[in-house]
Amino acid sequence: IYLCTNAILLKDFLDRLPLSPYLTLSIHLDGMEEDHDRVVDQKGTFKLAIEAVREAKKKGFRVTSATTFFEDTTLEKAEEFLDYLKPLGVDGITMASAFRYPDAPDQDHFFGRKKTFEFFDKLLEKNKKGRWDINHSPLYLEFLRGKREYSCTPWGNPNYSVLGWQKPCYLLDEGYAETFNELMETTEWENYGHENNKKCADCTAHCGYEATAVEEATSTFRGMVESAKLVFQ
């Protein structure tokens, strides 16, 4: 379970959460303080999130960051932020580029698909000798660099909240199912992905594409070999 949170109240709830290898606290952090607070439109949230990261690590939780880069994120800003996370002991970094989904509060600062690939190709080229602990599979990172073409697997990362199971993914607000079976059986999965739905046209998010990359890496001999080579590069 990846428990996604903005971490504003997380410190107050840590004692209620079980310490488990199957639970990861995924903390929303969209850059350094100025950028993060601007993106979420609330001053002080970056400091609260960082305090929560430190406290969660102190208590023994597995903690990752959930980071979105926007069009105005420079390579220098991204490097500074990723370097900042290292001494905090964050167990992994998940990254995505923002894309213009219908309910996004900010409709003006998005990478297109082409710019996404260009940005991550340059950024990931700087990730030498384990500089950053990136919590993605090797083949997904190749996709993010524009070196592979994948289709979305929208059912690969089911999302549950107090409202129920979100259809089809957390980036598109198209209702909720009361049960997991209802989610799987009533969602028209074939209607999603950048080839099939204009809402998804610029999406490269790991919630849909990581599952596709992992399937290739674990279900084909070629995928296994290519994935292994990338790990040891």
At which residue positions do the language-model features occur?
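Short, acidic/turn-prone active-site loops that include or flank metal/cofactor-
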Residues: A7-I8, L29-E33, F221-M224
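Flexible mid-to-C-terminal extensions adjoining Fe-S/redox cofactors in radical SAM and related proteins
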Residues: W165-Q233
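Conserved Radical SAM active-site core
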Residues: I1-C4, I8-S20, K58
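A generic secondary-structure micro-motif detector
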Residues: L3-C4, Q42, E71, W189
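Structural motif corresponding to alpha-helix initiation and N-cap regions
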Residues: A7-K11, L75, E79, T186
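Radical SAM enzyme [4Fe-4S]-AdoMet core and its adjacent flexible, acidic
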Residues: R16-L163, K167, L171-D173, E216
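Structural motif
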Residues: C4-N6, A66-T68, F232-Q233
